[in-house]
Design a protein with these regions (language model features):
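Cysteine-nucleophile amide-bond enzymes
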Residues: 1-167, 174-185, 191-349
Length: 349
């Protein structure tokens, strides 16, 4: 019976059902995070993560590394995540990605399950290097088996839902000497939604490598359209600002149409990611935005190592089985307590 149960739980249909639950949990999590206007990007602060005037302890966190490089929940895991849902916190986008991943687990398990199924150490946040030396369920000692698919070659063959919840990043291709804005050398994301057309495009082209080459084309074409304004390409290519477009000469208009044709690809329009503090937007927005921030280098897109369909999947399955076992035991207890001692000899009416 145990082998049969394991086979069912490891069946593709069960994994598919889990993927839909995970996707819904991801969307709930990032909605909470992006709706908190007090969760902001790093500014002038004393540590890597800043908990404002109230401090970390008052918002449910305990520091274990100096300069704000490592925190874990003090008591209630769910209460600690509330700091990012409703409190005042500052962090860069790497921590934002960690928080989105952990918040997804909170939404998936529910508050009670999130508190019971994970230890504080497993929910550590901080620099990525810090997490490797902890029990972090994301990157530390308890992460277990990782799925490595940087260019999404395998994931792109599994359908749109296989992407949702997966962590990744957009990073500069040339070395750091080509960066003008070090704070935008990379963007860390969690995939929130993938349209059918975007999934089909990724499957057809075999993942992200094709789009890294497209990013290079976009970057080359954009050189001819550079001009004044901090958000020039964001306005031209994402907002499609008619007034700004009208200032371009005929040759630039032709180049703009070429750029827009490239960015109208379903992947750029329908592959939506959450990036702190920008919220959920199509990946094409980030490609356009980074043309403004670091115009001297193209960018590439990768998924990071993750355990959504290995360790975290089985952790969730174990929790569901525990709940079923507890419910069955409770029902049996109620039945036993409700059965009179004389029931076996007949009952009186």
């Amino acid at each position: 019976r145990g082998a049969a149960l394991t086979a069912v739980l490891d069946d593709a249909a069960t994994h598919c059902a889990y993927a839909f639950e995970l996707g819904a949990a991801t969307r709930r999590a990032v909605t909470q995070l992006q709706n908190n206007s007090h969760y902001r990007f790093s500014a002038v602060q004393l540590g890597w993560i800043g908990f404002g005037w109230r401090g970390a302890a008052a918002q449910g966190w305990r520091g274990f590394r100096s300069f704000g490089r490592g925190y874990q929940p003090r008591s209630s895991n769910a209460q600690a995540l509330d700091a990012f849902y409703r409190g005042q916190v500052r962090s860069e986008c790497g921590v934002g990605r960690q928080v989105a991943q952990l918040a997804t687990q909170r939404e998936l398990f529910g508050d009670a399950g999130f508190n019971e199924a994970f230890t504080p150490g497993e929910l550590s946040i901080g620099t990525f290097l810090t997490l490797h030396d902890t029990d972090s369920i994301l990157l530390g000692a308890h992460a277990g088996e990782f799925f490595a698919d940087g260019k999404a070659v395998q994931t792109s063959q599994l359908g749109r839902q296989a992407f949702v919840g997966a962590p990744g990043f957009i990073a500069h291709v040339f070395d750091k000497s080509y960066l003008d804005d070090i704070h935008n050398q990379a963007e860390n994301f969690v995939v929130v939604d993938v349209s059918d057309a975007a999934a089909q495009a990724l499957a057809q082209h075999g993942g992200f490598a094709y789009y890294d080459a497209r990013n290079r084309q976009i970057w080359e074409l954009a050189k001819q359209l550079r001009g004044p304004g901090k958000r020039r390409f964001e306005r031209l290519l994402y907002e499609r600002d008619a007034a700004l477009r009208a200032t371009l000469d005929p040759q630039q208009q032709t180049q703009l149409r070429q750029l827009q044709t490239l960015l109208d690809d379903p992947f750029y329009q329908g592959f939506s990611v959450y990036v702190h503090p920008k919220g959920t937007k199509p990946i094409g927005y980030h490609v356009a935005r980074l043309l403004d921030r670091n115009p001297r280098t193209p960018y590439a897109i990768d998924l990071t190592l993750h355990n959504l369909r290995t360790t975290l999947y089985w952790r969730w399955i174990d929790w569901q089985l525990q709940r079923c076992g507890a419910a069955t035991a409770a029902e049996q207890s109620i039945e036993n307590s409700a059965t009179p001692a004389y029931a076996g000899r007949g009952t009186l009416h």
